[in-house]
A protein has these predicted regions:
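Membrane-interfacial terminal anchoring regions of lipid-handling membrane enzymes
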Residues: 1-367
Length: 367
C-alpha cells in the first residue's frame, strides 16, 4: 500500500481545497433574523443598545449582506418585500442628497439602514422576545425608549448565532482594526496599516476563511478602495510622499463597529498567549491549558479588563494553540493520547517572543 502523501506541497493543496469548500459554504450561508440580531447586539460598543439603534444596526447588516450577495432567510425577504416602498423612498432620499455612496460610513444612522431596520421590525421583535425568554438578553423599559443588554453569561450563546454570518464582515473588521490600532494624531501610515492587516489576517487564519482566489494584497487593495469610496477613510500624501489615511468623524462609529467584530478573538488569543507566557513552566495538556485560560478569562471579564465573555470559548483558544505550534512558539510532545504542550524553540530561546506577540495583539483591543 502506498504511503499517504504528507509533504508540504500536499498540505498546501489540502488547505487550499478546504478553503475553497468553506468559502463555498459561506457563500450560501443564509442570513437569519437571529444571526443579524445577535451580531448587532454583540458588536455594539456599549453595555446596552437602544431599540431604534438596534433596528438601524440590523438594517446596516442587511445592507452589508446585500453588497456581498448573501442570501436572506424567507422571513427577512418577505418583510423587506412588504415594506419595499419605504426602502425605495430612503434610497431616493439619499440619491437626491448625493449621499447614497456614503451609506456604509453613515452606518446604522443612514436613512437606508433605518428604513431596512423598520421594514423587518416585526421579525426582529420575535427574535428579541425569544432571546428574553431564554434569558440571553434583558429588556429595560424607559418612558421614551427601550434598551436591550446581553446577559453576560449568555453572550456565548448569542455568539453562536452571530458566527453564522460573521464572515460577511471579516475583511472590513481586519482593516478597521489595523487602521484604528495605528492612528497617531488622527492619521495612520498606509504601509504600516498593510503590514498590521497582514499580521491580523495571519494570526486569525484558523478562525476565518479568506477568498482563495485573491492574494492578501489584492484583497487589501479592494477593501481599501471600498473604504475610501464609501467615505470610511480619507487619504493624503505627507511631505515625504507617503500615504496617510484618516477616519472622518462621521465614520467613527461604523469603523468601531467593524473593529468590534474581531474583539472576542483578539481578547481570547491575548489571554491564551499571556497565560502561556506567564504560567507554562512545565509541559501541560492542551485541555488543562484551555481550562486555565477560561478560568482566568472569566475573572478578567468580571474585573472589567475584558469586554467579551465569549473570549473564553474553547474553539478559538484551541485555534490559538495551533497557531503558536505552527509558529514554533509552542510544541506538541508525546503521542496523540498523552500529548503535552511546552514552549517551542522560538520562545524557549527567546522568552520575549511571547511577550512581544501579546503586546502587539493588545494594541488592537477596541478602545
Amino acid at each position: 500500500m502506498d504511503k499517504p502523501n504528507t509533504g508540504a506541497a500536499h498540505t498546501q493543496f489540502v488547505r487550499r481545497t478546504a478553503y475553497r469548500v468553506l468559502a463555498g459554504i459561506n457563500d450560501v450561508a443564509i442570513v437569519t433574523p437571529s444571526a443579524a440580531t445577535a451580531l448587532a447586539l454583540l458588536t455594539h460598543p456599549r453595555r446596552g443598545i437602544r431599540r431604534d439603534e438596534l433596528l438601524g444596526r440590523v438594517g446596516f447588516i442587511l445592507e452589508m449582506a446585500g453588497r456581498k450577495q448573501a442570501p436572506l432567510s424567507n422571513t427577512l425577504k418577505n418583510a423587506l418585500k412588504i415594506r419595499r416602498q419605504e426602502v425605495a423612498v430612503a434610497m431616493a432620499e439619499m440619491d437626491e442628497a448625493g449621499t447614497r455612496h456614503l451609506s456604509l460610513s453613515m452606518g446604522a444612522g443612514s436613512p437606508l439602514a433605518r428604513a431596512r431596520g423598520k421594514a423587518v421590525v416585526e421579525v426582529i421583535d420575535e427574535v428579541l422576545s425569544r432571546f428574553i425568554q431564554k434569558k440571553q438578553i434583558r429588556r429595560h423599559r424607559f418612558e421614551d425608549d427601550v434598551v436591550y443588554t446581553p446577559v453576560p453569561d449568555a453572550r456565548i450563546n448569542l455568539d453562536i448565532y452571530k458566527n453564522n454570518i460573521v464572515h460577511l464582515f471579516v475583511k472590513e473588521a481586519i482593516l478597521a482594526a489595523a487602521i484604528r490600532g495605528n492612528l497617531e494624531q488622527g492619521f495612520a501610515d498606509l504601509d504600516r496599516v498593510r503590514e498590521e492587516a497582514s499580521f491580523l489576517s495571519d494570526i486569525l487564519k484558523y478562525e476565518f476563511v479568506y477568498n482563495p482566489k485573491l492574494s492578501f494584497e489584492e484583497q487589501f487593495q479592494r477593501t481599501m478602495a471600498i473604504f475610501i469610496e464609501s467615505g470610511l477613510l480619507e487619504a493624503r500624501l505627507d511631505e515625504d510622499g507617503r500615504t496617510q489615511i484618516s477616519v472622518p468623524v462621521a465614520a467613527h462609529e461604523t469603523m468601531l463597529v467593524c473593529h468590534r467584530v474581531l474583539e472576542p478573538w483578539l481578547e481570547g488569543y491575548w489571554m491564551l498567549i499571556t497565560t502561556v507566557d506567564a504560567h507554562l513552566s512545565v509541559p501541560t495538556t492542551e485541555k488543562d491549558l484551555v481550562k486555565r485560560v477560561q478560568r482566568i478569562t472569566e475573572r478578567r471579564y468580571q474585573e472589567g479588563d475584558l469586554t467579551c465573555a465569549e473570549a473564553g470559548s474553547s474553539v478559538p483558544l484551541k485555534n490559538c494553540v495551533s497557531y503558536l505550534v505552527e509558529t514554533k512558539l509552542l510544541q506538541r510532545q508525546g503521542s496523540r493520547r498523552d500529548q503535552t504542550l511546552s514552549l517551542g524553540e522560538r520562545s524557549a530561546d527567546d522568552p520575549a517572543q511571547l511577550t512581544e506577540l501579546a503586546q502587539r495583539l493588545r494594541r488592537y483591543f477596541c478602545v
